[in-house]
Amino acid sequence: FFIKLVEICSEKHDIPIAMHLDHHEDYNEIINAIDIGTKSVMIDASHLDFEENIKKVQMVVEYAHKFDVTVEGELGILGGQEDDLVRDDKDSKYTNPAQAKEYVERTGIDSLAVAIGTAHGVYKEEPKLDFERLAEIRAVVDIPLVLHGASGVPADQVKRAIDLGITKVNIATELKMPFAETLREVLINNPNESDPRKYFGPAKESMKKVAIEKILMCGSNGK
């Protein structure tokens, strides 16, 4: 139902909308998402060893490509928390350029999420991206590269990452926080308010403002 709703909105506003299933590890859940119409999926097997990662991703790619569904894989491990998935920063592991080349060739994925110094969630200190590593990956991998954990990364670093080959930038925390903060503020100031339109509206506007800022930062406006 939701997928059809989004498709209708896309047609009405004449803009491309990508329905993407992000960070899933379960093969059956990914297959189900494809079967109901999702056009882009991410299989996150980055926590597995190199060969197991490849094997699991190959299975998803084989099924997805039958239906012209694009697949994003991940090599390297980001610390922090993504929804219910928590990984300690000490377990983070940067993407190896040589492995990235082999990984892309053997899996047949359409885009690659790389670990170059970002993390999911809120940063304890300003992140410093490994641009040299990113350039090395770009030199041997010719598919779109994805930057996860971009919330809180300074704009100049994001822009440089894009210049060096990042095609997709994932931002969640910086969108969720203003939504939640505004929602709390409205309900605290209006404790008897029961109309969802009155408290969700301002929250959505706060999120929208940040979304516009990020779209402009990435140079994605009008595309």
Q: For the regions a protein language model found, what residue spans apply to each?
A:
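Family-specific functional microsites
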Residues: F200-A203, M207-A211
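Alpha/beta enzyme core
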Residues: F2-H13, H23-V141, A155-I171, M177, ...
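Short catalytic/ligand-gating loop segments at beta-alpha or beta-beta junctions
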Residues: I116, H148-S151
